[in-house]
Regions:
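Exposed beta-strand-loop-beta-strand "reactive/processing" segments of non-cytosolic proteins
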Residues: 1-19
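Extracellular ectodomain segments of secreted/surface proteins
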Residues: 23-24, 29-52
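Surface-exposed, polar helix/loop patches in the mature regions of secreted/periplasmic/lumenal proteins
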Residues: 48-70
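Short amphipathic beta-strand/extended segments with alternating polar/hydrophobic composition
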Residues: 17-20, 29-32, 76-79, 107
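Short proline/glycine-enriched turn/loop motifs at strand-loop junctions of beta-rich domains
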Residues: 12, 57-63, 93-95
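Ser/Thr-rich low-complexity repeats and stalk/linker segments
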Residues: 64-107
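Short acidic/glycine-enriched loop/turn segments that link adjacent beta-strands
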Residues: 1-2, 48-49, 81-83
Length: 107
């Protein structure tokens, strides 16, 4: 069980990183995804598509992003409060059934 989340490095830069669940808490895993990287999304090992991802500092309106293929959610990105929001997801429009759902934080 793993998910993607936002992490802030000591130099202040923001990265999208993979977290793995260990003993009921998520811990940072290696191979962090940096701002602007092209990310390959796979479903059961089969490559579906790639998309570019970016983070924008000082923007915390979005709490969570769900990426779905059809009705099936294949990735959930959680954004830590007061960190940043993902502002660009470039999903090729030749893939049917793609959807990106934004969950805004309740104040």
């Amino acid at each position: 069980d793993s998910r993607y989340g936002l992490a802030r490095l000591q130099d202040g830069s923001l990265i999208i990183s993979k977290f793995e669940k260990k003993r009921n808490k998520y811990v940072l895993k290696g191979n962090s995804i940096q701002d602007g990287d092209i990310v390959d999304i796979r479903d059961n090992g089969k490559s579906l598509t790639s998309y570019a991802i970016g983070v924008e500092p000082n923007s915390a309106e979005i709490d969570q992003i769900h990426i779905k293929v059809g009705m099936e959610e294949i990735m959930e990105i959680n954004i830590a409060p007061n960190y940043a929001a993902i502002y660009h997801i470039d999903i090729p429009n030749n893939i049917e059934g793609w959807g990106v759902e934004y969950k805004e934080r309740d104040e």
